[in-house]
Regions:
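Solvent-exposed edge beta-strands and adjacent loop segments
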Residues: 2-83, 131-149
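Short secondary-structure transition/capping segments
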Residues: 16-17, 121, 155, 160
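Short amphipathic beta-strand/extended segments with alternating polar/hydrophobic composition
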Residues: 29-34, 123-129, 166-170
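Structured, beta-strand-rich domain cores
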Residues: 61-127
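Mixed-charge, glycine-accented linear interaction segment located at domain edges/termini
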Residues: 129-192
Length: 192
């Protein structure tokens, strides 16, 4: 049975990406996904252009490019492990997170998450993400406590082999679905 609706972002995870080139052959590996608790919202816009070619007075041919996605992930707090492993902040000997200006590039990572569905959750993975440093903001407490959030600006580019994103479907096998957060799912190159 298929989902009719989706709602409720949850189970956000990230897995550091390592890209290696040996003898001209590029390979990709991922660390074990780690949870990022406290997901509030995600909004990712598709990146790419559609270019028409006109002939005979009509759009004769149209090309589309897939340049991945960009947008925001809002969460309660960015975990310390994500700040050190992905954003490359340093934890000093006294346990203080230190951000330095010489970090010009954050680590690439896979972003895994899911939306509830009326039948079954829909699980996603974006394979080549980068995140920019979050803004710092808060406000004073008034009559009631209103928790603040932190937002990561994300870019999910295609990997050099073209892989952008995967998601579970109506017929995803049980082992793949159940193991979604144990390892980063990589599609079989001989399929599809």
């Amino acid at each position: 049975m298929s989902n009719k609706v989706k709602y409720n972002l949850k189970n956000v995870h990230a897995a550091k990406l390592t890209e290696s080139v040996v003898d001209g052959v590029t390979s990709f590996s991922y660390d074990t996904p780690k949870a990022i608790p406290g997901a509030v919202s995600i909004s990712l816009d598709a990146e790419g252009d559609s270019s028409p070619f006109y002939a005979d007075g009509i759009v004769y041919f149209r090309t589309s490019s897939n340049n991945g996605y960009s947008g925001d992930l809002e969460m309660a707090l960015i975990p310390e492990w994500f700040r050190t492993e992905i954003l490359r902040e340093k934890l000093d000997a006294k346990g203080v997170l230190v951000e330095k200006s010489d970090v010009t590039e954050t680590e690439k990572f896979a972003l895994l998450f899911e939306f509830d569905g009326d039948v079954k959750a829909i699980r996603h993975v974006l394979y080549n993400c980068s995140a920019s440093r979050p803004s710092i903001e808060s406000k004073t407490k008034e009559d009631t406590i209103e928790p603040g959030t932190e937002t990561l600006s994300l870019t999910a580019d295609p990997r050099s082999d073209g892989l952008v994103k995967s998601r579970t479907g109506d017929t995803t096998d049980k082992a793949t679905y159940d193991g979604w957060y144990q390892t980063v799912y990589i599609p079989d190159e001989t399929e599809g």
